[in-house]
Regions:
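Alpha-helix initiation and N-capping motif
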Residues: 39-43, 133-137, 158-161, 213, ...
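The feature marks either
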Residues: 125, 132-137, 141-179, 186, ...
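Long, well-ordered, tryptophan-enriched scaffold segments
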Residues: 54-60, 159-164, 296
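Short low-complexity stretches enriched in small and charged residues
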Residues: 25, 93-98, 106-109, 148-156, ...
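Transmembrane and membrane-interface helices of multi-pass
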Residues: 1-149
Length: 425
């Protein structure tokens, strides 16, 4: 019985591995659920492959399966018949303990992120990242995310879609300040600060609650405040791809979780890197959460700083390092930066549930967390003004998404997705 099991597993692993090796040369990404779409027409699937190559691939699959099976086949033949253990309770307890211990490596550790394809990404050369991926895991991961999206969208003929979309593009007079040339400098340094769950309902200048974020209010008065700015989704992973890549969010899926797709997206950081910018991403949490690492490497980030770069004593919240510590780290990275121009992106986290922050200024936990991060923003900007890079640095503050506040707000209410984007140079 063991030998039958080993034979089946060996053949499946060999077929996936060899199939992946062949398909990668055509597709440029590791094997996923895509080949299964062609099972209904296998002749068409292999039409572009020469007959001799097809025969060679099948032969190599059997050879590789035999190599995998041979040691297990020999080992299984040497095991004796099963005997009931003398101490059944002790044996069961040991078996249960060993099975439970497997949960940690299967999950991928103790952090908020689970095992995902993006965890093995380590290089700015995508081919090396692909080489580190286990093809069997890649396929199984893809199958777990497979979903039929056809019923979630309405499709139109291109002509009708153009008619519907054209009015959304505006076309009226520009609302950009007439003296905008004073904001434009040649190859400025760029700081993109993404504020976790910040919402227009907490900003007075957007018609929200007064007194929550006085520092961002001040920055908005000194720079440019985009008041007609709305979040693309309600999740960070989808908001980030919208901010960096201009990719619209889908109802039940996140493109960040599909590295084979996200690697082909455009990106602000990718374009700036090609233009000679030094790029860096900072996040006080787990950079492997929702395949973030693979996405930011694909977007041209030269360096990623995350929770593992901070001592355990500073990881004080469920999500990681609080914002006052990470803002201080962000300031240090800018101060120590020797190469210009540079683009640095920073994702905050303290204003995420459960809103545990080292400050108690407001009674409401969400608003208090916003006020706390706002105070960190104020301290950071004041210190940054004293650095030489201040005069040639563009700072953009934007929320990844808003927050359901108050709790009874309806899903169709625009306040649910209204976010602000103050810009200062």
């Amino acid at each position: 019985m063991y030998r039958v099991y080993f034979a089946i597993v060996s053949f499946v692993v060999a077929a996936i591995t060899l199939g992946d090796a062949v398909l990668y040369s055509y597709w440029g990404f590791r094997i996923d659920a895509t080949p299964l779409f062609y099972l209904t027409s296998p002749a068409d699937a292999v039409a572009s492959i020469p007959a001799w190559e097809t025969v060679l691939i099948v032969f190599l699959i059997f050879v590789y399966a035999a190599l995998l099976l041979w040691p297990m086949w020999r080992l299984s033949g040497k095991t004796g018949s099963w005997q009931r253990p003398k101490k059944s309770i002790l044996s069961f307890a040991c078996l249960l303990l060993l099975a439970a211990s497997l949960f940690i490596p299967i999950r991928g550790g103790f952090t908020v992120s689970t095992m995902n394809v993006g965890k093995v990404y380590f290089s700015d050369r995508m081919a090396l990242n692909h080489a580190a991926i286990n093809p069997v895991f890649s396929l199984m991961s893809s199958l777990s995310k497979s979903e039929d999206f056809s019923s979630q969208y309405r499709f139109f003929e291109p002509e009708k879609a153009d008619v519907i979309f054209e009015p959304l593009r505006g076309g009226g007079p520009s609302v950009y300040p007439a003296d905008s040339l004073q904001w434009v400098k040649a190859r400025p340094n760029v700081l993109l600060i993404v504020l976790e769950s910040f919402s227009g309902v907490a900003m007075e200048s957007l018609g929200g609650i007064p007194g929550v974020m006085p520092n961002l209010e001040k920055i908005a008065s000194e720079g440019i405040l985009f008041t007609n700015f709305y979040a693309n989704s309600f999740r960070t992973d989808r908001g980030l791809t919208s901010i960096l890549s201009g990719y619209p969010a889908q109802p039940t899926a996140s493109i960040m979780k599909y590295p084979a797709k996200s690697q082909s997206l455009p990106g602000i950081s990718k374009s700036l890197r090609k233009a000679g910018y030094d790029t860096q991403f900072l996040y006080g949490g787990d950079a492997d959460f929702t395949n973030m690492r693979s996405y930011f490497i694909s977007m041209g980030m030269d360096n990623i700083v995350c929770d593992r770069d901070f001592p355990l004593s500073q990881r004080l919240s469920k999500w990681g390092v609080p914002d006052d510590v990470t803002f201080e780290k962000f300031y240090s990275l800018i101060k120590e930066q020797s190469r210009e121009p540079f683009m640095k992106m920073f994702l905050t986290l303290s204003s995420h549930e459960p809103f545990d922050v080292p400050m108690n200024r407001l009674e409401d936990k969400y608003l208090n967390s916003i006020a706390y991060t706002d105070s960190c923003v104020g301290d950071f900007v004041e210190k940054l003004k004293r650095l030489p890079v201040w005069d040639n640095t563009l700072i953009v503050f934007v929320a990844d998404h808003a927050k359901r506040y108050p709790q009874n707000v309806e899903n169709h209410d625009l306040s649910l997705i209204h976010i602000s984007e103050p810009t200062r140079q």
